[in-house]
Regions:
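N-proximal low-complexity "stem/linker" segments adjacent to membrane-targeting elements
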Residues: 1-69
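A conserved acidic beta->alpha catalytic loop
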Residues: 73-86, 105-107, 144
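Acidic donor-binding/catalytic loop of UDP-sugar-dependent glycosyltransferases
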Residues: 82, 133-135, 139-157
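Conserved donor NDP-sugar-binding/catalytic core segment of glycosyltransferases
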Residues: 149-188
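A recurrent flexible, glycine/aromatic-enriched loop bordering the glycosyltransferase active site
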Residues: 200-222
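Acidic donor-binding loop at a coil-to-helix junction in glycosyltransferase catalytic cores
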Residues: 240-246, 260
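Active-site donor/metal-binding and catalytic loop motifs
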Residues: 255, 261-277
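Terminal low-complexity segments of carbohydrate-biosynthetic enzymes
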Residues: 285-428
Length: 428
């Protein structure tokens, strides 16, 4: 993997390896298994709370983690304040193994995506230096505060088989100052996202990400194994949205992602942030324009159901080796035969599904306006109630006209019910 480092933009670095805190719980299983990467830009006001939360990490029994059980990388990029100085000072105060890298990035690279990639690259290299087996890279934001069991819960999910773990987020007390209309919109979006997430879990269940789970993708809480990080070539080189780009690449390679409901990070509710396109920009945009479009993942519920159902169908066909022999799926999705053949030859299901979404006219995304959310929520609730209640009947009823081409499919999956069963019944 090519690391984004050069002597032209790294001005200085300092490494701190303080002695063990005598009050910390020591266990050989925790010895420097993970490193937390934090990109920082002018965060002297919020960085102390971030590092304090990491200093207070405990295992799942509530015992303090040994101070040598994890490391922290602070990548201070283009800072005009005392962020780097404070990081060094707090590292000594909290007895944290801390590496502070100060960098002056050129304008073309002075963005959140590049800073986070560099921070995570330093974390990966640190694990490599110490030859850590099963090493894990975590990342959060300097304006965020993780829970006391954040590291332990992430590692538990990794130990359960995940290649990457995503945590949920909540706004801090600054979020209380946002307009009431924005809070109401946030409640509607959260409610609708939860409904779509459960619908997807029913129609395309994944063993490594069982229900319940969330669907939040935020760099405020990501954990990824070092092996997976190297496999995807590191954090994608994008100026913003690096968290979503990383998840997309993991999905493309069929890596196992757990959206862990037990992990929640408190992040800043400010509207003047440091990273263009980040949470602060989104909050400011929606405060200034209450009718701004919703996130692209909040699509009309009928399309979301169709997307999840077909994803589950095709996942099963590929797993059973029947994607090539059963060509009915391509005709129903409006995908030309040559494209379908290329999809069948894709190296992973994730790559195949990405091509399906690109080629099929059924899955073109339409952005929702916030005024549409109440009706979409009502429809999604009805659909979900039917799916929950009639799951057994739907599993047995797979001989409808729509699913006749799929008789050879597994009979015990909601993903093989026809469109009229999953969508059409919810019009009333």
């Amino acid at each position: 993997m090519d690391r984004e480092f050069s002597e032209t933009d790294v001005l200085s670095s300092a490494i701190f390896e303080p002695p063990l805190n005598s009050t910390s719980y020591e266990s050989s299983c925790w010895r420097r298994r993970c490193v937390v990467a934090i990109p920082v830009r002018d965060e002297e006001q919020r960085l102390p709370a971030c590092l304090s939360a990491l200093a207070g990490q405990r295992d799942r029994r509530g015992r303090p983690l040994a101070s040598d059980s994890f490391g922290i990388v602070v990548f201070a990029n283009n800072c005009r304040d005392r962020s780097a100085y404070l990081a060094r000072s707090l590292g000594g105060q909290f007895s944290l193994p801390l590496r502070v890298v100060e960098a002056s990035l050129p304008p073309a690279k002075a963005h959140a995506g590049s800073a986070r990639r560099r921070a995570m690259d330093v974390a990966e290299a640190w694990l490599g230096e110490e030859r850590v087996r099963g090493g894990v890279i975590l990342t959060t934001d300097a304006d965020s505060r993780v829970s006391a069991d954040w590291i332990a819960t992430n590692l538990a999910a990794i130990d359960a088989g995940a290649d990457a773990v995503l945590g949920d987020i909540a706004l801090d007390e600054e979020g209380d100052l946002l307009p009431l209309a924005l809070h109401r919109r946030g409640e509607l979006e959260s409610a609708y996202e939860a409904l779509l997430t459960e619908l997807s879990a029913l129609l395309d269940p994944l063993d490594h990400n069982p229900w319940p789970h969330h669907a939040t993708i935020s760099a405020a809480s990501i954990a990824i194994t070092r092996d997976a990080y190297l496999a995807v070539g590191g954090l994608p080189r994008v100026p913003l949205g690096e968290d979503k780009a990383l998840v997309a690449e993991l999905v493309r390679l069929d890596r196992k992602i757990r959206f862990c409901p037990e992990i929640r990070v408190i992040t800043s509710g400010r509207v003047e942030g440091r990273a263009p396109g980040g949470v602060a920009d989104t909050l400011r945009l929606r405060s200034n324009d209450p009718d701004a479009f919703c996130d692209e993942l909040l699509e009309p519920f009928r399309v979301a159901i169709k997307r999840a159902k077909w994803r589950g169908r095709l996942r099963w066909l590929r797993r059973e080796g029947k994607l090539i022999s059963n060509s009915a799926w391509a005709r129903e999705l409006g995908i030309p035969a040559p494209d379908a053949q290329r999809i069948c030859r894709a190296p992973s299901f994730g790559a195949a599904w990405s091509a399906v979404e690109h080629k099929s006219p059924l899955f073109h995304r339409r952005l929702l306006k916030p005024t549409e959310l109440p009706d979409q929520i009502s429809g999604a609730r009805r659909a979900l109630a039917r799916l929950r209640k009639g799951a057994l009947a739907m599993r047995e009823h797979v001989e409808s006209e729509v699913v006749m081409p799929f008789r050879s499919m597994h009979p015990h999956s909601l993903t093989h019910c026809g469109d009229e069963q999953v969508c059409g019944l919810f019009a009333g």
